[in-house]
Amino acid sequence: XAITAEPVGTPETLEYRVFIQKDGK
C-alpha cells in the first residue's frame, strides 16, 4: 500500500496516521 497521511497540524498525529497506514488497519 501506499502510505497516505494528511498533515493535521501536529507531528504526533501525523506519525500516528502514518503508523496506522503502515499497519494496514
UniProtKB/Swiss-Prot annotation:
It comes from the Eukaryota. It is an enzyme of class 3 (hydrolase). The keyword Magnesium applies. Signal peptide: none annotated. One of its GO terms (molecular function) is inorganic diphosphate phosphatase activity. It catalyses: diphosphate + H2O = 2 phosphate + H(+). Keywords: Hydrolase, Magnesium, Metal-binding. Belongs to the PPase family. This is Inorganic pyrophosphatase. It comes from Cyanophora paradoxa. The lineage of its organism: Eukaryota, Glaucocystophyceae, Cyanophoraceae, Cyanophora.
